[in-house]
Amino acid sequence: MRRYVVLISLLALLLGLTIWITNLEWIKEGVYKPFAWSDLLNSTRAHLEMVLMAEVIAIAIGVPLGILVTRPGFKKLTTPVIGGASVGQSVPSLAIIAIMAPLLGFGFQSAIVALVIYGLLPILRNSYAGINNIDPAIVEAARGMGMTRGQITRKIELPLALPVIMAGIRVSTVITVGTAELAVLVGGAGLGRITLTGVFSRQALTILQGAAPTAALAITLGFILERIENWMTARGLKVKAQMS
């Protein structure tokens, strides 16, 4: 309960700060002029669109690939696959975004590819861990009941691994929200346009006008995904977690 109070208070503070800065007409005439509400809302929408598109692609790649490397015929690929994704995230986000520009050109596609690379590891790693850590006795029991490999995956493994997979998606989403600030450097849209305008013009309030809603967006999406994670967790797993 206390954690939720802290999150809501922080979110209210960030939103209040954003509203206050955006409604300022001037601070020292000719020195500071905030971005208009229309610019702020359009940038927020573009930022959210980039994050959601990158996450959908990262999920479509990371979850199946994480499951695939748990299978007997593909376990030898675990180290190179997880290791490759780890290398992708260990490289600074600015470097990845800069690399995409000469490869794919400036524009939306370069930003999306960079965000997918940077957000893939948590989803891939948690998908692998969620499936790999399931008690083999459960899988054997399902196989003994005559279930096929596909049925075991859909009806047994995925429901049990879902909380771990959702945790990876939540972490990836929060990372992507922050990384998307830099997408403006390769022609992407989003709140990074406001933040970097403040950086280049040395206006702290303009930086806050872009950074505060970005932080609020990360907190909001993280909270929503955490609630979805709890809702999708099987009741038996919740009871087991409370007893442990």
Where are these regions (language model features)?
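N-terminal, non-cleaved signal-anchor transmembrane helix
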Residues: 1-56, 230-244
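Loop-to-helix entry region at the N-terminal start of transmembrane alpha-helices
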Residues: 42-54, 101-122, 162, 206, ...
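Hydrophobic transmembrane alpha-helices
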Residues: 60, 84-90, 100-103, 113-127, ...
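Cytoplasmic-entry segments and transmembrane alpha-helices of multi-pass inner-membrane transporters
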Residues: 65-100, 125-133
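Transmembrane alpha-helices
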Residues: 117, 149-183, 209, 213-214, ...
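Short helix-to-coil transition segments within interhelical loops
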Residues: 131-137, 141-161, 187-189, 200
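Hydrophobic alpha-helical transmembrane segments of polytopic membrane proteins
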Residues: 191-232
